[in-house]
């Protein structure tokens, strides 16, 4: 997020950052509290090109959702309930179809199609945003759509893993997130 120094000072961003581990959520809160708006700037996006293992990704994702649960609990609950409902419906559909209820197959597929279509749209938008990554998209672009059903289950796992924890590990330190304005260094 970019802002002018005058805006930073008048919105008291430094005060909002005190005791915080999340600069993004607290900056957003400071800007909104000041009655100002935030605009999405697509050209400010940067591609992450580093590699990470599945374990590293899951650790990062759980950390992000723990932070979200502490700083924006309503948003966390909305995401959790949406994933729980979607995965529950998907599981029910698979059970019915596996039990011989082929009538449910079109309904099950209708559950997959919108998410997969959004994946196609995300991939197309990413291609436009990152033209220098055309070779990567040519090789891996398909995952945006075809792994969407699996990704939904991964995110449900991440939501569940973030449900009851307030401790995060970041850059070798463990922090306890007591509130949006109170973070304790554990070790």
List each language-model region with its residue ranges.
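Catalytic donor/gating beta->alpha subdomain of glycosyltransferases that bind UDP-sugars
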Residues: 6-9, 14-76
